[in-house]
Amino acid sequence: MNNKEIIQAIKEARENAKERKFTESLDLVINLKGLNLKKEDEKILAFIPLPHQRGKKVKVTALIDQALVTKAKADCDEHALLEDFKKLDKKAIKKLAKRTDYFVAQANIMPKVAQTFGRVLGPRGMMPNPKAGCVVPPTADLKPLVARLQNLVRIETKNEQTI
């Protein structure tokens, strides 16, 4: 299918649908053919920026040390300082992961982030990802990153050829 056919199909679906009393959303399902997902190099992990924001506000948590604490307090929904990592147990990390959509981490403390949060965030696919721009230097400005994460969506194939 080309872009015009896809846009036309979406327009028809929206026009023919009956009026709802809630905010509707569209789900896009893509079937991929000719991929062997048992091979690591054929798996897909991409972060795609959308032209408009998603329906809800994306919650961002910063995992930082003292260098970014003022910027994180101003721009992110929550933050965890390097000094507080030792106080966090597995239960607290799970609660934090439930209420967070993206984690942003400072690059120079990534080994400590992986050591503390890796067992909980790793299997959930929530570790700070450099592909999404979630691993930042100690001098980074978090405001444009948080704004970009509001429009970002993650696409991943695990064991099925459907996205």
Where in the sequence are the language-model features?
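Interdomain regulatory linker/hinge segments that flank or connect interaction modules
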Residues: Q8-N16
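Long, charge-patterned amphipathic alpha-helical coiled-coil/hairpin "stalk" segments used as oligomerization
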Residues: L82-I163
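Short loop/helix-cap segments at secondary-structure boundaries that form the rim of catalytic
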Residues: V69-D75, K95
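Active-site regions of enzymes building and remodeling cell-envelope glycoconjugates
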Residues: D75-L81
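Translation machinery proteins
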Residues: N16-T70, K91
